[in-house]
Swiss-Prot record:
Transmembrane region(s): 182-202, 254-274, 349-369, 376-398
UniProt domain comment: The large envelope protein is synthesized with the pre-S region at the cytosolic side of the endoplasmic reticulum and, hence will be within the virion after budding. Therefore the pre-S region is not N-glycosylated. Later a post-translational translocation of N-terminal pre-S and TM1 domains occur in about 50% of proteins at the virion surface. These molecules change their topology by an unknown mechanism, resulting in exposure of pre-S region at virion surface.
UniProt name for this protein: Large envelope protein
Single GO cellular component term: viral envelope
Keywords: Acetylation, Caveolin-mediated endocytosis of virus by host, Fusion of virus membrane with host endosomal membrane, Fusion of virus membrane with host membrane, Glycoprotein, Host-virus interaction, Lipoprotein, Membrane, Myristate, Transmembrane, Transmembrane helix, Viral attachment to host cell, Viral envelope protein, Viral penetration into host cytoplasm, Virion, Virus endocytosis by host, Virus entry into host cell
Pfam families registered for this protein in UniProt: vMSA (PF00695)
Modifications made to the protein after synthesis: Isoform M is N-terminally acetylated by host at a ratio of 90%, and N-glycosylated by host at the pre-S2 region.
The organism's taxonomic lineage, starting at the top: Viruses, Riboviria, Pararnavirae, Artverviricota, Revtraviricetes
Virion surface-side positions: 2-181, 275-348, 399-400
Covalent S-S links between cysteines: none
Positions bearing carbohydrate: N320
Length: 400
């Protein structure tokens, strides 16, 4: 392990605290490999370098015997690399930067044209020409930067900018776009919640109107509160589960929900029939049945679209058939009217009555105004629960 040293050695022998098994690879140019001799002087400017033979001296080290590098080497030229441990505190900052005397503000950065003039010499044309070089193009387009193929310049600056951002990172998001993108769904959600709360009040309002018919001129009250189990006074529309009238209240609410669902289905059916999405064949003259099919050989050609079903044909006679085109709108309504008129002959009189009312339009309008004036408040109280459904119906009517 080597005898302890009584005196400090100079040079590499002094470095006894830094073990380095690779000390026999010195990092200066005195190696004969660099042909350093008297004719070729040393160009290593390290003032603390040792003579070459002293690099072979053995140092104790922290992990046993080993070769200690000459000056610096893999450890650098610092005092710690030389084996000199310095424990003195660092020098205080000069007075100009001392906090006691006040620090000067950071100077304003000079403009880009002064610090990086080479960056101001580029324009889009020069940049496109530089992209023709495969080595430069490979920095922005790794998939197309090979030197074996010729690449065309980027046609637009926008596409070039997007490619550079995809390489260096996404740009900062525009908060205005984020706000406008979130504002729309929030308003829709608020409108949906408002309509939902209003729609949920429809059954309760209709239930109140239904029960009020049983208490004409008398304040409504639940008959179940006079049973054997006394319950506090309450309305028949807010019976607790322990009240005998609770089951009747649930039954009324269920019937009201079915009525609302039927009303929505009727509205949807009318809307589809108006748009011509119900290609129902009308009743053929002189018959109570219909036969829908393509027109092949018809005595009367069908006018309009040729898509199937395009016409209504009677039973063929002698290979020919009578064809009637399907109406493009209100086909189902016309079918229902023809079907009802064939079974109830008195309905045909309503057509003349409607035509007569249309001919007397001022009288009809005055009659309608008088009816609204007389029965308007009662109609409003009855139809007010259905007002929240009006925007939904209007939206469906406009969208389909």
């Amino acid at each position: 392990m080597g005898a302890p040293l009584s005196t400090a050695r100079r040079g590499m022998g002094q470095n006894l605290s830094v073990p380095n098994p690779l000390g026999f690879f010195p990092d200066h140019q005195l190696d004969p490999l660099f042909r350093a001799n008297s004719s070729s002087p040393d160009w290593d400017f390290n003032t603390n370098k040792d003579n070459w033979p002293m690099a072979n001296k053995v140092g104790v080290g922290g992990f046993g015997p080993g070769f200690t590098p000459p000056h610096g080497g893999l450890l650098g030229w610092s005092p710690q690399a030389q084996g000199i441990l310095t424990t003195s505190p660092p020098d205080p900052p000069p007075a100009s930067t001392n906090r006691r005397s006040g620090r000067k503000p950071t100077p304003v950065s000079p403009p880009l044209r002064d610090t990086h003039p080479q960056a101001m010499q580029w324009n889009s044309t020069q940049f496109h020409q530089a992209l023709l070089d495969p080595r430069v193009r490979g920095l922005y387009f790794p998939a197309g930067g090979s030197s074996s193929e010729t690449q065309n310049p980027v046609p637009t600056i926008a596409s070039l900018t997007s490619s550079i951002f995809s390489k260096t990172g996404d740009p900062a998001m525009n908060m205005e776009n984020i706000t406008s993108g979130l504002l729309g769904p929030l308003l829709v959600l608020q409108a949906v919640c408002f309509l939902l709360t209003k729609i949920l009040t429809i059954p309760q309002s209709l239930d109140s109107w239904w029960t009020s018919l049983n208490f004409l001129g008398v304040p409504p009250g639940c008959p179940g509160q006079n049973s054997q189990s006394p319950i506090s006074n309450h309305l028949p529309t807010s019976c607790p589960p322990t009240c005998p009238g609770y089951r009747w209240m649930c039954l009324r609410r269920f019937i009201i929900f079915l009525f609302i669902l039927l009303l929505c289905l009727i509205f949807l059916l009318v809307l589809l029939d108006y748009q011509g999405m119900l290609p129902v064949c009308p009743l053929l003259p002189g018959s109570t049945t219909t036969s829908t099919g393509p027109c092949k050989t018809c005595t009367t050609l069908a006018q309009g679209t040729s898509m199937f079903p395009s016409c209504c044909c009677t039973k063929p006679s002698d290979g020919n058939c009578t064809c009637i085109p399907i109406p493009s709108s209100w086909a189902f309504g016309k079918y229902l009217w023809e079907w009802a008129s064939a079974r109830f002959s008195w309905l045909s009189l309503l057509v003349q009555f409607v035509q007569w009312c249309v001919g007397l339009s001022p009288t009809v309008w005055l009659l309608v105004i008088w009816m609204i004036w007389y029965w308007g408040p009662n109609l409003c109280s009855i139809l007010s629960p259905f007002i929240p459904l009006l925007p939904i119906f209007c939206y469906l009517w406009a969208s389909i």
